[in-house]
Amino acid sequence: MKLIKIAAMMICALMLFSCAPASPGVDHDADENGKTTNQQEDNGKLINSTVKGEPSGWLDIKGEPLDNGEVSDEFTSATNAFALALLENLDDDWTGVYSPASLAMVLQLTMQGADEKARAAMAEALHIDMTNDDINVNNSRLLSALGSKGINMANAVMVSSEYALNGNFAAIAANFYRAETGTFDFTDGRSVVDSANKWVSDHTNGRIKQLFETLPKDTLMLLINALDLDLNWKTSFDAEKVYKDLDFHGTNGDQKVTLMAAKGEFLCAEIDGGKVILLPYENDECFMAVALPPEGVSPNAYLGKVMGRWNECKAREAELWLPKIELNSRLELLETLRAMGMGEALLGGSGNFPGLLDADEFIQIGDVIQAAHINVNENGTQAAAGSGVAMKRGISLEDKFVVRCDRPYAMVIVHTATNETLFVATVNNIE
């Protein structure tokens, strides 16, 4: 069998901004080097949190073992609903890729420092009606579930040495999110950018080397999430059946593409007039769902009907024709999230995030950006994405199942055991 690799990296970064350093708000002791640390007891284990002092780089902070229980259906249903809500706010002819799983995790980590108004707004936009404790436990379980061979998710927190990281937040980040934590000199923006980009590169096997170019003025904290996949197809595409210069009938007219063919037994179904086929990976822990809507229906609208209905697919002989494609996307999501109900947590709202830092500051989400890349070919798939959240001081043959994607279609990568939607891509045009 020819191995077809998928490599997908999702990086979410949270950037906090303020105009003035806060006075230290926690008790602390100087260590032998004159640096200060605070220790908070959480579940019987001491968790080091940062306080105002000299920058020390990455700290040796160890959290509790991840919870290996089952991720709840309520939790994954929320992520999948969030994925669809984002899609509904994109243009019907949008072509691109994004990762709801990684974006949801970094936003849910941010929620741990939110006040009541900000938290309620974020929960509405994230479609999640769970306590912080339940959210944290399920994220711990998701990290554990995604920790198998070929899949990895990681988090990091970078804090300005002029500010004190809230001890309770530090414990949550370490115990439930396995976040690597460090203190840095944010007055030296280039050094912080280099440290952040090195962390991203290290946690994506070098596939994303530069998430940040520069830091906006008054940045005081970064929260980063990385999701990395490197898996082989269980059934490979036929290398001898790669057809060049065929027409893809996009919404902007016909474009010449290369189509790859695969035959064999797949899980597939006709749902609401369209076709869905599932492509499993060798570890049986993830699959890609390819959704071909009925004529005249956009991939966005069709995903709204079929997302989460993968269990309707049944085994049968099938044939898939899938384009070789490379997509690059950039989404500025602040106004999208505002439209989804997150306004009170965003710049201009009345919500605050007092639980992130021991600082007397009024902090809000100032920007949310996601950039993503996916490359699908007969030899493999590489996918990469970066997301930033800036926190600022407030102010059809009957007897043969054929899926021929020579017109707009969609792709979804799903973690089988948890049903978590890892990546979503829609293709309306191919340039």
Which residues make up each language-model segment?
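Non-catalytic, conformational "gating/processing" segments within enzyme and secreted inhibitor domains
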Residues: 41-48, 93-94, 133-294, 313-397
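Extended hydrophobic
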Residues: 223, 275-291, 398-431
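Hydrophobic alpha-helical segments of integral membrane proteins
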Residues: 16-17, 327
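Detector for small/aliphatic-rich hydrophobic stretches
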Residues: 2, 6-12, 19-186
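Short, solvent-exposed amphipathic alpha-helical segments in soluble enzyme
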Residues: 304-307, 390-391, 428
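Extracytoplasmic/secreted cell-surface and envelope-processing proteins
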Residues: 116-122, 297-300, 329-331, 384, ...
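Internal alpha/beta scaffold segment
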Residues: 293-314
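Short, solvent-exposed loop/turn and secondary-structure capping segments
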Residues: 119-122, 168-170, 234-239, 300-301, ...
